[in-house]
Amino acid sequence: METNKLYECTVIIDGGLQDEAIAAAMEMVQKVITEKGGSISSVLDIGRRKTAYPIKKKTIGSYAHIEFTAATPVIAEIERVLRYEEVLLRYLIVHLTSPLLEMRKRVEKYSVVIGSPEDNVASETDAADKVAK
């Protein structure tokens, strides 16, 4: 029997759809994963963003990120179903290996929350005043 591995799936849903249609598309993606034998561990709805380039003549997409565990043969079945969904502009399923997970932990550990541009200007002004004294 095949062991389950950790995967992440990022989808871009047509941003021109109503919020209800986008939510229905997200439910559909989650349903496909669970029906094919996957177990979802987290769902992150990133929201509407401008795409870097037009995809199927669309420039706005609603991004979502799903982490799940599944057996390797199941991934091909999930991709086969997602490939023909018209509301999905793009999808990508990636196997999360140990080096990727370790890198993610390091990034989370050392990441710094950057404030607003006004905060940065104020801190630079304060630093300049301290140097001048």
From Swiss-Prot:
SUPFAM superfamilies registered for this protein in UniProt: Ribosomal protein S6
Source species, domain of life: Bacteria
InterPro entries: Ribosomal_bS6, Ribosomal_bS6_sf, Ribosomal_S6_plastid/chlpt, Transl_elong_EF1B/ribsomal_bS6
Alphabetically ordered keywords of this record: Ribonucleoprotein, Ribosomal protein, RNA-binding, rRNA-binding
GO molecular function annotations of the record: small ribosomal subunit rRNA binding; structural constituent of ribosome
Pfam families referenced in this protein's UniProt entry, alphabetically: Ribosomal_S6
GO terms for cellular component: cytoplasm; ribonucleoprotein complex; ribosome
Gene Ontology biological process terms, A to Z: translation
UniProt-listed CDD domains: bS6
Family assignment from sequence similarity: Belongs to the bacterial ribosomal protein bS6 family.
PANTHER family named in the record: MITOCHONDRIAL 28S RIBOSOMAL PROTEIN S6, SMALL RIBOSOMAL SUBUNIT PROTEIN BS6M
Function, in words: Binds together with bS18 to 16S ribosomal RNA.
Name this protein carries in UniProt: Small ribosomal subunit protein bS6
Originating species: Chlorobium luteolum (strain DSM 273 / BCRC 81028 / 2530) (Pelodictyon luteolum)
UniProt gene name: rpsF
